[in-house]
Structure formats: structure tokens, C-alpha cells
Curated annotation (Swiss-Prot):
The lineage of its organism: Bacteria, Pseudomonadati, Pseudomonadota, Alphaproteobacteria, Acetobacterales. Residues 1-11 have a biased composition (Polar residues). This is DNA ligase. Coiled coil: none annotated. One of its GO terms (biological process) is DNA replication.
Amino acid sequence: MTNPDSPSLSLTPPEALSPAEARAELERLASRIAELDDAYYRDDAPLVTDADYDALRQRNAEIERLFPDAILKNSPANRVGTAPSSAFAKIRHRVPMLSLDNVFDTEEFAEFCARARRFLNLPASPRFVAEPKIDGLSISLTYENGILTRAATRGDGMEGEDVTANVRTLRDVPQTLHGEAPAFIEIRGEVFMSKAAFLELNETQARLGQKIFANPRNAAAGSLRQLDASVTANRPLALFAYAQGESSAPVAETHWDYLTRLKDWGFVVNPLSQLIEDENAAAAFTTRIAAGRSTLPYDIDGVVFKIDDLSLQRRLGFVGRAPRWATAWKFPAEQATTVLEKIDIQVGRTGALTPVAHLQAVNVGGVLVTRATLHNEDEIARKDVREGDTVILQRAGDVIPQIVSVVLEKRPDGARPFAPLEHCPVCGSLAIRPPGEVVRRCTGGLTCEAQVVERLIHMVSRPAFDIDGLGEKSILEFHRDGLVSGPADIFRLPAREDEIARRDGWGSLSARNLSQAIEARRSIPFDRFLYALGIRRIGETNARLLARHYGSFTEWRTQMLAARQIGSDERLALGSITGIGPTIAEELVDFFAEPRNIDTLDELAGMLTITAPSGGLSSAALDSPLNGKIIVFTGTLQAMTRPEAKARAESMGAKVTDSVSKKTDFVVTGADAGSKAKKAAELGIRTLSEEEWLALAGGG
């Protein structure tokens, strides 16, 4: 298991990230999660605990929620498992074997229920089936005319490994279904090993001098994924059946009835499965199962809740890698008590000041922990955390362990409340907490050493200077070795071409190509230059708005210097620019309030030719008539609920908003459409009837 104190894990809360940092963090998370998936699903050798893995996925999901424009094509949210091993033949699942989203408490489960109700427009939550979440290996079994013909692991969710010969050796897998069954059906289940069988297997392995398994899940996965089926036959594997894939004919109208059919066909279904009538019953069931967890003969890590009505499951469908009609209520991680020795301030690459607790080393859930995130100064004040306190630590819900509470009776005399820093501990610039925000930020921007690398990477990115051959890796190397310490140094690199050519991995041709690429970017449109500065909240769209409003770099600089004066005409004008507003205006004023930012800005601008703003927006070829459009729904739709319509529109690339503005492209009007339809008419925005919407969206 890896140590969560590894510096590769960011301590910066998602809400404190800039768009550039969010993209970089999502790329790191995608790479790390893929690595962990390979280790878990393909190699049967997990590198981190389940709680740490869930926390990584939670962090990824939260960053994607806050920064939808930064979502990667290979997002872990759209991926399950890992590619099948080349040692096995591949079998494609007719119905993908997707994963489940997680909840960790009653509040999150209530929100899961509320989302389903809103999507389906139901007055109350539907009935659920609850099943203990077995910690094993998912399997798909194909039966044709009642006879087992194929068995495949989950793999990457779309394609799994052919383990048919091995599965035939499992006692819990019927070779022929008992009674009547569809001509073709896929049955899903979980292969696992009991705790007693696991201990017995490891004793045998040790006696024979063979591999010792880390836990029952690893033992089950390793036993099933044997190239020699006779090895699998001698391993004590079991299976609980729990779901259906493709079927040539309907089997049941409810999931509960389907479980009954599985038992009729000869499968073992977890006897603890239960019908659940409401959210209170779900919470009670989870509490009861968690309390008896240690007494069960097999490992579980939570409870799975599925909406019982299969017709509702079909209506709800899927989002990303998970169904909307099911969730896994994961059990909480372990807690431990330790002493908070010091509160340190970490400055993130976007200037966010994040407090970090340095702890006396303590073992939590099998991992030695020495640090924990404190998130922000409000969180410290809310929990009244002080240096010297004895604290309760928990490793659930975040990549870095969290302090849950303080043991007040053990507080030492003289322990002082935390006092927020007013200046950056790295560069000394003013640290400002904008109104309405929880994060304090360094205003050093272009000059703070903690931020400079991220700023430089952002500066050379495609929407900014777009310097070919100068990416993140080169920036990191050049900064490490002293070739680049600030933005203007980028344009001094051609003068050091010979030095770069002598570097490992470069050579004369590469160095010359880099010099030419840099020289080609000495002329840049004003809007791209603005974006390249990396000022918080100044993305591509806002950079265009500002560039078009001020017209030139010189005019913008003059106006911004004047806008530093509270109440000045220039400051009022800045906040009144359409699409900018007071929050973004404050970011610009804060940037120009730091003299070193102005010096760095002038130094960079002096090396460039900053031309007029670029023309219209660039966009990819449209895959559908809705791609890139802004849509508002109003009134009652007949063919689908509002959430279903929104999901349809978003799946085709549209953005759905709740209010009509000049930016709105279409307003879809259902029955009893109200003020939104009227406003659309006033603004001259095209309205669509439900029939026209369905035609545009590809039918009902």
C-alpha cells in the first residue's frame, strides 16, 4: 500500500484550483487511477486501500463538477476497470459491466434518492433492494438454451477476459439452468473467497513455499484468473449472483423477482438481500449490516441499493460509468487519535494558501499518517483546531486524511487559536481573501516562486502562446535548471540555443526548432496575451471580452492602473463590462495592486508585439445541431421529464441553463410555458415546441 503522505497527492481543495490547475490535476488523477485500476483488476495487487481509491475518484468527480470545461476524454468517470490481460482471449459484453457511484452517509444517500425522484418526477422514493457489497471479482456468465457457454471478467467494462474453463470448476455456477429460461441470457455475479477459506489457502501456500495472498479479494481474483483451470478447481471459490445483462426475453418486472428467478435456476443469492421501502429503512439496514460486518464469513465493504422496479431502471439509464438507479453505500474508514504538532501553510500553484496539519505519526487503516489537510481557515475556526491539540483523524472522503474533531479535554494550556497569514509565506506578497470565498490567495501571481511553474505551463499552452515543443516537461526542466524563472525568460531562450542543444534529449535540431517556435510567437493577439497571463477567472471567454472592450494592451494597462483607485470611473467601468462583473473586476484590481506583477507584465510585453484582438470564436466541427448550443426548457413536457430532456440535450453537446438571456440559442416550450417563453419572444430567441425539440434531438 502506498503512503498517502506522498507529495504527488495534492493538498489543494478542488474549489481553490484555477482552470489550468484543474486540468493538470485531472490529468494526474486519470493517470493515477488508471495505474491503480491496472494493479487491482489486471494484476490482482492493489496499491492503495479501497478508501484511498474511492477518495481519488471523489476528488476527480468534484473537480469535474467545478470545472466541466476541463473534463478529459479519458476521464475515469467514464471508465471501468482496465483492459483485459493479453494472456486471455477477450469477450465483449453485450451489456457493459459498469461500476457504481458511492455514498458515505445518510445525507448523500438522501441526495441519491432525490436525484432519482427529480429525474422520474415521482412524489416519493421508489422501493429498493439492498444487497451486501461483496469484495470480490465481478463475472458475467452467458447461457444459451440453458447451457453455460461463456464466462468473462469485467475487464474494462466493455470487454473482459475469457475465463470460461476456470468458471466451469466453481460449485456455485450451474452448468445448466434449472427450469425454463430465455434462449440467451447474461447473468452477473461476484466471485469471492470466504475468510476461513482464505486463511486455509494461505496456510497451504506457505507450506508449499508458494505465493501468499494479501487478502481474500486478491486470492479470489488470482485463483480465477489462472491459465491452468485445474489450479482454479483446487481453490475454494464461491459466487453470489446479483444482476442480469443481455436477455432474449423478459425475466421479471422487478429486481427482487429477478433474484428469485436466479435462485430457481440454481444460483446462490446473498441471503442478507432485502426489500427496502424507504430511506429510513435503508439507513437502518446499512447500520445493522455494518455492525455485524466482522461476524460475516466473507468480506464486504458496503451495501448496494438498487431501485426495484426494472422499468424505472430503464428510464433512469446511466451517466458516465455508473447507473442512476443504483449506488453503493460504503462503510466509513477507520479513525485514530494523535497530536497536531504544527499548522503549516502550503502555497498552491494558483496562489491558494492551504493550511496543513503536521501530526505525530499514527497508523490509520493500515497506513502511517503524518499530515492532514485542514482545507481553509473557516474550517479551522469551525473545529477550533490548535497546535498541540489531540485530534481524531479519519481517512474517508478525501485523498489526504482529515481531522474530524478535537479532544478538548486534552488541550494543553496556552494553546492559541490559529491566526490567518496576511502575507504569502513564499514571496511575501499580500495574501487576500476575496469576499464570499473560503480560500486566501497570494497576489504575487507572476512572481511567486510557488506559482511560477504553473503560470509558465499555462502561458505556453495552446490557447495562450501555443509554443510548439515547449510543454510541461520542458518547462519543469528549464525552471529546475535555472533557464526559466519568469515569463520573459521564455523569450530569452533563443539566445541560449547552444546551451539547450547540449542538454540531454535535445540536440542542435531540436534546440533550433524551439528557438524558431518561440520567435514565431513574439507577435500575439491581445486576447491570447491576456489569457496567457493566467490571472484568476480570466479564461478564454473573459479575455476576449476584455480585449474587445479595451482594444489594445496599452489602453487596458492604463485603465487597470487607474482602476486600482476605489470609486474611480475606470473601476466602475470595469465592473460594468457585459460578462465581467464585480468579482472578475476584483481579480484584475488585485493583480495590478501588486507592483511586482506590473514589473513582470511590462518586462514581458516589452519583448512582444501585441496585436489587435483575434476574430471570432474557434470551434470544432459540430457533430449534432445541438452541439455548443445553450438551451432553456420551460413548461411541462409530455414525452419525457425535465431531467430526461436535460440529459438528452447534454449528451448531444448542448448546455442547459435555467434562465433566458441573450446568449440562449433555443427555448423549448412545453405545456403551460410561462415567463421564460415570453422573455424569449422579447429577446428574439427561437422557441421550439416539444415536437420540434424531439425532431432536433433525434426522436422521443
